[in-house]
Amino acid sequence: MSKRALITGITGYVGRGVARRLLEDGFEIIGLVRNSEDDFEKRVAELRAGLGESEKLTFVRGDMTDDSALKDLNVEGVTHIVHSAAVTRFNVEADLAQAANVDGSRNILEFAKGCPQLGCFSYISTIYACGLVDGEVLETRHQGPRTFANHYENSKFDAEALLQKEYGELPWQIMRVATIIADDDHGGVTQQNAFHNTLKLFFYGLLSLVPGKAEVPLYFVTGRFVVDAIAELTQHCERQSIVHICHSQDETPTLGELLNLAYDRFSEEEDFRSRNILRPLLCDAESFGLLVGEAEEMGATLMSQGLGSIAPFAKELFTVKDIKNDRFRAALKDYRAPDPKVLLNAVCSHLIKTRWGKRAG
């Protein structure tokens, strides 16, 4: 039987990587590209350049926020769906998070109901869908009500609840992914996020205070680890299962360790040492809020933009989560965790060498 996968979010980092892996494993791929893009053909050309010319690779227009966008899509032969499309910014607005991440998920779930040959629906979520909780976070359904650091977390919680409550007949599985900080264990970075923005502010001496507690674990993974896991588990689907694509707490660095390691690595650079930059101090949420407010009053500077990407996640840096991954370990054929200090050092080295993407690596 042929394998045919529909991938939403194929223009994104994870979706594109999963498409590449499934193509290698013999899948036919249908990539859903937003029909609101004026440069649809250009985006398709870029995807083909990255994924390779293949008869097994096709693209269709479709906007997940439009409930009629998928009505004309041929469901014949669709055996797998990987729903990775989402707005993942921590500072996403509430209405956009609802439209893209919750309502958009409902639309693709409704489409999935009409796929008679569907064997697996992989929903890509986040380990932070649990919200602002301390202690153990299990690979089970999150019970509400909860509080969240931002609308992104809240929308992922709501989308998970929607999937479990209204679509029990589908062969779904939820994959909660940790923060991707590098492409692979070598530390190369092709897509930056709030983590990299924080280190950038640190390196240039624009971060005197960091919100949080030193003992808070920071769950980091590489893109290759995530893509390989999603591709493998999508092909060996355990219906109505939830897994955490992350490493365990004892394999995870803390906020304090990250700051110390980054400072030591940055201090090897002459231009960093010459500026006599001090190690950032950990502070409470109120003090950090004052810093963000002062930066905003200065206008659109590197500092205000960087802090703006950190602030919506700041509350999480005060919660000590013990993310469990026992089910994930058991399901994966070959689980391996890199040395977190070696990985972080490699990432810092890459960011320094490329000056956060401004120079060739």
Question: What does each model-found stretch correspond to?
Answer:
Residues L233-S309, K358:
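Mid/C-terminal beta-alpha module of Rossmann-like enzyme folds, strongest
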Residues E160-G187:
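Conserved beta-loop-beta element that borders a ligand/cofactor-binding pocket
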Residues E93, N197-F225, A229-L233, H244-C246:
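A conserved pocket-lining segment of Rossmann-fold NAD(P)-dependent short-chain dehydrogenase/reductase
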Residues A314, F318-G361:
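Amphipathic terminal alpha-helices
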Residues R61-D103, K113-G114:
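NAD(P)H-binding glycine-rich loop region in Rossmannoid oxidoreductase-like domains
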Residues A5-F27:
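N-terminal Rossmann NAD(P)H-binding glycine-rich loop of SDR-like oxidoreductase domains
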Residues A182-F195, L233-V243:
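Glycine/proline-rich active-site loop of Rossmann-fold NAD(P)-dependent oxidoreductases
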